[in-house]
Curated annotation (Swiss-Prot):
This is Topoisomerase 1-associated factor 1. Residues 576-596, 792-811, 896-965, 980-1178 are annotated as: Disordered. Residues 1079-1092 have a biased composition (Polar residues). One of its GO terms (cellular component) is replication fork protection complex. Residues 896-905, 981-991, 1001-1015, 1025-1034, 1117-1128 have a biased composition (Basic and acidic residues). It is found in: Nucleus. It comes from Aspergillus clavatus (strain ATCC 1007 / CBS 513.65 / DSM 816 / NCTC 3887 / NRRL 1 / QM 1276 / 107). PANTHER family: PROTEIN TIMELESS HOMOLOG (PTHR22940:SF4), TIMEOUT/TIMELESS-2 (PTHR22940). It comes from the Eukaryota.
Amino acid sequence: MDDEGAPLSESAQVVDPDVRAHVYSLVTALGGFNGENADRYVLGDDALACLRDIKRWLKLHDEKNNRMDVARCLGEANLVNGDLLPILTLWSTSGQNSKFMSRIALACLELLVPLTWPLELHSEMTVNHHRHTPYLQQAQVLYKRGILGPGGSSLLRTIIRIGLPSMAVPRSDRTTRDEGILKLMLYLLRNIAVISPHSRLSAEGDEEETSRSATINAFQDQDAFALLLTMCSNVADDFNLQDVVLLEILFHIVKGVNVEKLFMNDTQRKAKRTEELGDLLQKESSLRREYAKNAPTRHGRFGTMIWVKRDDAKVSTVSGQDVLKDSQTTLYKMDQSKKWNKPQVRRRQTEVTVNNDFNTPVNLNSTATKNLRIFIEEFLDSGFNPLFTHVRKAIEREADRIMDINSRHYFYTVAWFLEAERVRRKYQRERHSQEDKSLKKMEPDSFALVASVLNQETFVFLNRSMQKSFDNKEVEDLTAEMRCFTQILLTVQEMAQSPLDDDQEVADNIQNRIFYEETTHDRIISIIRGYKDQGFGYLDACTQLAHVFLRMLEHYSKENVDMQIRSRRRIKRKAKQDDQAIDVEDEEHASEDEELMEAERVSKERKFDFKRFAAKFCNQKCVDTFVAFIKYYKELNTDQLKRAHRYFYRIAFKQEMSVLLFRLDIINLFYRMIKGPGALDSSKPIFKEWEELVRQILRRMIKKIDQRPALITELLFSKINSTVFYLEFGFEKQTISVSKRPPAELEVDPREAKTTDEKLSIVVRVMIKDEHINLVKWISEVLRLAADERESWESREQQPGEPTAPNPMIPVKPDDEACQKAMFSNAKLRLLMTLIGFERLGMEDVPGASWVVPSSFTSDDLRHTKRVIDQCLIEPATEDPDQDLSRLIRRKYANDARGGGRDEQNLDIDFGSDSEGEDNVPDGPLFPPNHRSKANALDQLKKQRQKRRKEDGDRETPDDEVLEERRRARLENALARQAKIKSDLYIHASDEESDEEADEEFFRLEEQRRKEQAARIKHALLHGVVEEISDKSSKKTGRKRQSDQHTTLNIDAHTKRQRRKNRTDKLDEGDDLVMAGTEAQSPDSPGLGSSSHDAKGIENTPLTSDEDELEFDDDLAFSRDRNRRKDFTPNVDKMVIEPAQQDADPAAPDEDDDEDAPVVGSSRRRVRGGFVIESDSE
């Protein structure tokens, strides 16, 4: 092998001799023209094996080693034109019925595709690639020349015939071999369309035979266009894997073709060419006139050199006879002799894709124009929608066959065909008008032929691709996408003018969708502002897009006054911590509550203002983009000149921002466009518009210089917003600074620090750790000065006879501006001042707010606080690795749920709780069920008694059926009594009135009942005997249950609501005879209404009337005291069980009680934590 690093000399071998010998031997063995008939190609004995060996050499040597040696040898051996093409001709004429010859033809096709594969210059090329690429490019041009078939050969038709059998097979029945044959056929057509004579290489006189016109004519004559139409129209059904190759073929056929010339007839095309020739002659005459002004005379054969004396007494040397004309010419030539070594900017290395360049125009002859127009019209009618729908879906799902370049092919081809559809409609209307046919009689065509690229899916794909290309600075892709977007807008604009209602409705819907997103507006503005030497194609595309978008949006906003757009902006959301509240420099030790400010996009609709949107184009970057575009004014056509004219007119007169154009280079450019040298052609209509525009701009500039002499200096520079405002209005723009929000309020965790001194120590040590020791020292100094001032005031106040002023508040004065800013922005400093007791004056928390030491602080208080702070400054904090002091400082919430506390305003309001064990419900429920607190306590005692009896064997526990029957009877009885409750018991008109006599009567009865009960309990404890309640009193009490009900209701009606609550609660707790809790006892029959108070009486606690407001849970009281007092209260059970026996069976309340008779406790359900607990032991 040759050394790639060695320089190429005469002795250097381009290709390894062994490789060349093997390849030449295979080509020789393939066959040749030797024989009786010199015009007939004769195959060798092992022709098929030779073709396969050559393919194997290409694959294993060139592709595997990334070289081009075998391809170079095959080109030198003339394999394509000398062997492969004759073999294909032989097969097409006589060997189509031979299976062997069909295999030979397919093998030839397999070699033609890699040998004609387009060559691109890229960054990964090796020395071997650079050595062989120029030769292979010339060889490929010769391959194309031979395939296109000069002299009437039909090799393209022959190649298509190879793939026809595979096309005829249904897609479901095709094998991998069939798909491969179709791919080979299409790739060869693609290669033929791509290959073109290289501009840097010698053409050898075959430009016309390999030009775009020759390719189009060959495709038309040899049925390649018919093949493409068939496959495009059926791409979704039969050729779904060939969509990308079809797109590439279309791209390389139509790229660079002028659509306007394509649809012209011969007369129009001839007139257009004549006009172009006239323009060229006019430019030549203009150049000659400019040259004649400074042309040398007949005496100019001698050299000329002069000295130019400048103002600073220096002399410069200028040569040439043209400097003798005048001093201005002399100075101009001297300026031209100066050279500016402009610094080279390191740009991003971009791939050179010559074959995919669509900005270079291509000229077609008349025959090729006619053939291409026929194909384009048929493709628009049948294949446009299926192909582009299928390709877009494949690109969106990133199919394996998709490459990065295919997205560019897609957008450019869509743009080209949309423009072709609009131009075709335009010339159709012109032809109908020339044929004296009314436009009304002509049936309008619908835009459904191109509907596949006018749907929402395409718009989403286009916007996403534009944003991606703009972000990644992919210039060529973005150029194709801008062209596509522009043509979509122009197509929609024409749809809006269609006579068909459906087209108008669809156009309005599309415009609404496009203009609704503000991100689309912002993207276009960013593209215009972001131009920087991306090339003329990019410049042309972005200026056209801005021009069309701005005009259509202006028109649409005028028709839709209430137009709404969706605006997306970034807002900052603070989750749990404020950036200004806590210093998060050390993220490892940050509190769990700290979170960084995160940004999210929110969408909201707002009314669209076109003036506001158009003003975004009024900046120096947009102006510079159009100025860079207009610098090519000599090469621009009328539409492009009009585009730039409309923009500058909008800037100067519609937006009243002509100051942006007052720059020397811009003014000089405008002047040269009108006055020369190299001015616009004055015979063109656009010249007059530009002339008037430039005149008005210069007039405004001169007038503005008279008003603002500072503009003379500003002519040298670009204008920023503040400069533009000053030059327009004569004064600086007044800006109002928006005040910042105060940081979040902090607090020290009260669980870690109880006293104020501890909290102060924590805050001070955290500030010292955060390197804010200067602020701590400043606070200490403020406290010292305040203590001295307060001490002097206190000493004056103690002197007798001297009137003293009231205790004044002492202002907290910051040392410098940084300290003043920290008083607002430093959350820990604000926490420290708050803990000390400093107060902020005023209601607004804004920067610069005043803080004062309140008058309530004494000098001793201030000195004590200062000592605490100074102690923290003197003694360094002990580093505890397990505890970070900064974690003890947290954000203070308005309603801190972590502490379980309530608002300070609601501390005195008891809302009650549903938690277990709490029966304190404000005002009680509206219709409460029977209270079970007393009964539950009795049940507990009964169960204990039953347990003792069971242990003694006195009695067995009743079965479950008896217990269930008794429980059901009790429940029915309780529900019946509850249903009798009337609302008058709880709500009465007299509740808002006061009755002192009723109050005194109520308290007297309560006091009497409490004393009697306390006396009975004391007697029972002292003597061990329970005072029995006779049958008479029991029956009497039973009778009073009915007779005293009316009295109880009257008493309740004359009391206040809160007092009624206390009384009824105590009656419910104490009266075991009234199960429903709605009847009061009379003084003659005291019950157990104050059992909880009696429990206190057991411990000899004196009872007062104030204890009447206390509320006890009887269950809680009994369970708490029962076990503790079991030893010294043996007869308590008798006292409690007697009335409980009456309540054991509510169905028979009048039955006489027998103390000695066995008693069965009622089976009551136990409730624990809201759950009913059933026990089998009951």
